[in-house]
Swiss-Prot record:
Protein source organism: Streptococcus pyogenes serotype M4 (strain MGAS10750)
Name of the protein described by the UniProt record: S-adenosylmethionine:tRNA ribosyltransferase-isomerase
Catalytic activity from the UniProt record: 7-aminomethyl-7-carbaguanosine(34) in tRNA + S-adenosyl-L-methionine = epoxyqueuosine(34) in tRNA + adenine + L-methionine + 2 H(+)
Gene3D superfamilies: QueA-like (3.40.1780.10)
Functional note: Transfers and isomerizes the ribose moiety from AdoMet to the 7-aminomethyl group of 7-deazaguanine (preQ1-tRNA) to give epoxyqueuosine (oQ-tRNA).
Description of how the protein assembles with itself and partners: Monomer.
SUPFAM superfamilies: QueA-like (SSF111337)
InterPro entries noted in UniProt: QueA (IPR003699), QueA_dom1 (IPR042118), QueA_dom2 (IPR042119), QueA_sf (IPR036100)
EC number assigned by the record: 2.4.99.17
Primary location: cytoplasm
Amino acid sequence: MNTNDFDFELPEELIAQTPLEKRDSSKLLIIDHRQKTMVDSHFDHIIDQLNPGDALVMNNTRVLPARLYGEKPDTHGHVELLLLKNTQGDQWEVLAKPAKRLKVGSQVNFGDGRLKATIIDELEHGGRIVEFSYDGIFLEVLESLGEMPLPPYIHEKLKDAERYQTVYAKENGSAAAPTAGLHFTTDLLKKIEAKGVHLVYLTLHVGLGTFRPVSVDNLDEHDMHSEFYSLSEEAAQTLRDVKQAGGRVVAVGTTSIRTLETIGSKFQGDIQADSGWTNIFIKPGYQFKVVDAFSTNFHLPKSTLVMLVSAFAGRDFVLEAYRHAVDEKYRFFSFGDAMFVN
């Protein structure tokens, strides 16, 4: 299959620039790929799609205020660093601007020198490995100096940074939010749990590769970015019990899907506690091993995320659903509306 097979027309005005006032008031398009049905609904009705005994699996990663603005002490030139992932200790892979001025050994100061970065390796496409030095606790220093790294297609400033976090965000480490989870409120999750649905959490730290366009025509030539994931023994046991009792594993978002399917692929369909790095690329032809249904936002044309949804529900039907969403003025991308896929 080619990248262009996953293209569709998307009017720019449908790209949501701000979150809705209430998280769960977004629209929800419920699709069933076997029955070939589509139903327009609202997100707080997602509870009606969940059965007692099902497991709802969510990614509890937390977005770091990963964009830092500093200057070189020798030239006072302005520098921007975007933290991508913690490689070891105080070393991070970052995206640097302007990268060409930052050679190995270069230093950058942030916040009157409260945080310092030394370039220790140069990567391609403006990437660098830096080592930070600071007093105190790194995350506290970062909270005071860093800014939330909103996706490149969002041009308006976010009034409340917590609206780019899920209500259950816990594990620091992402450069972007797992946006399918932004629709849930604490109250809605309580109602879902009261219905007899198991709430299960895993972690996948979302990298900026999630926004990287597919630059090749042939999907087999695309290199997926790697992201760190973790599933605890308690969570794995709950999911095994749910499967054994005939319940469904319902994933919230593509990051939860990629984690569960990475583990399912690694353990021949079994669900085991595990952690590591995944670069799984789920595209049409992939056989799902763990996930039975999922919710997700509406994604960019020609993106790996549209390909993932198509792997589950079929490309033609997914593109038909996307055309319906465009016609019905659904809001797209991170702050947009959601889809529930049976």
